[in-house]
């Protein structure tokens, strides 16, 4: 891996903590996570995207809030890879329209993080099982 990874997570505190545990459990990724931050407020998200350069965004918010998060993030940083984990499969088509790198139904698992990372080879992240 060529770079450190700055991960921005958006969702509830328990879901973000669980996702961080999954990320930290992936040896090929955790050694390169330099910093992670998690948010649950859309206005704060917009401010963070102005001041900080995340490598990727994990969206864990349910329903329309998750879609709004993706929309705002893509508006600010169109090339930011977004992994969107939702409680509703119906948002899959929206994730495609918003150019998300990956969409899956919750929960966040090592397997679906692995699938998501495979779609982001340009990040230089490799996952070894």
Language model segments and positions:
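Two-component/phosphorelay signaling modules centered on CheY-like receiver
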Residues: 7-40
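The C-terminal output helix
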Residues: 118-129
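Conserved phosphotransfer microenvironments
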Residues: 20, 42-46, 53-76
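C-terminal output helix
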Residues: 108-117
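Alpha4-beta5-alpha5 "output face"
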Residues: 74, 93-97
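A short, hydrophobic beta-strand element within the central beta-sheet of small alpha/beta folds
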Residues: 57-61, 79-89
């Amino acid at each position: 891996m060529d770079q450190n990874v700055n991960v921005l997570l958006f969702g509830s505190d328990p879901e973000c903590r669980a996702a961080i545990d999954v990320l930290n459990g992936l040896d090929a990724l955790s050694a390169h996570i330099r910093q992670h931050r998690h948010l649950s407020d859309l206005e704060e998200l917009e401010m963070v995207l102005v001041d900080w350069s995340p490598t990727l965004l994990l969206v864990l918010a349910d329903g329309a809030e998750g879609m709004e998060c993706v929309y705002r993030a893509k508006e600010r940083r169109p090339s930011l890879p977004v992994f969107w984990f939702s409680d509703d499969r119906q948002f899959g088509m929206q994730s495609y329209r918003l150019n998300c790198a990956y969409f899956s139904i919750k929960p966040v698992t090592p397997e679906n993080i692995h699938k998501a990372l495979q779609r982001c080879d340009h990040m230089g992240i490799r996952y070894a099982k």
